[in-house]
UniProtKB/Swiss-Prot annotation:
Subcellular location: Cytoplasm
Keyword tRNA processing: yes
GO terms, biological process: ribosome biogenesis; translation; tRNA 5'-leader removal
Gene Ontology molecular function: any one: ribonuclease P activity
PANTHER family reported in the protein's UniProt record: RIBOSOMAL PROTEIN L7AE FAMILY MEMBER
Keyword Nucleus: no
Assembly: Part of the 50S ribosomal subunit. Probably part of the RNase P complex.
Species assigned in the record: Saccharolobus islandicus (strain L.S.2.15 / Lassen #1)
Protein name: Large ribosomal subunit protein eL8
Gene it is expressed from: rpl7ae
GO cellular component, one term: ribosome
Gene3D superfamilies xref list: 3.30.1330.30
Family: Belongs to the eukaryotic ribosomal protein eL8 family.
Length: 127
């Protein structure tokens, strides 16, 4: 299956697992926003520390604006393979296309590591 058009880089599975763990920890000890509307607002306001986007969103237009907006606002973003897994990490009973970590809480070190690895991955793909 080919990647969606909004997926700008490949995320290794170990990193995707860390992303979901960071979302879980931030939900418990910090602050997150769930869903594309809330995530978009957090990015536009410059509040998001990390944006998480699911790769299996249909139609793609729901989240296609997020990578561009994040780049414009210089907010790091990362992908996870499943909107269902992202929804569960957010504490939801349903899937969610995207989420934003506003305050990482106990996940701060994990978020810092994720941002560093994402920047390394993006550096390789953009050169």
């Amino acid at each position: 299956m080919s990647k969606a058009s909004y997926v700008k880089f490949e995320v290794p599975q170990d990193l995707a697992d860390k992303v979901l763990e960071a979302v879980r920890k931030a939900k418990e000890s910090g602050k997150i926003k769930k869903g594309t509307n809330e995530t978009t607002k957090a990015v536009e306001r410059g509040q998001a520390k990390l944006v998480v986007i699911a790769e299996d969103v249909q139609p793609e237009e729901i989240v296609a604006h997020l990578p561009l907006l994040c780049d414009e606002k210089k907010i790091p973003y990362v992908y996870v393979s499943s909107k269902k897994a992202l929804g569960e990490a957010c504490g939801l009973q349903v899937a969610t296309a995207s989420a934003a970590i506003l305050e990482p809480g106990e996940a701060k070190d994990l978020v810092d590591e994720i941002v560093k690895r994402v920047n390394e991955i993006k550096g390789k793909t953009s050169s």
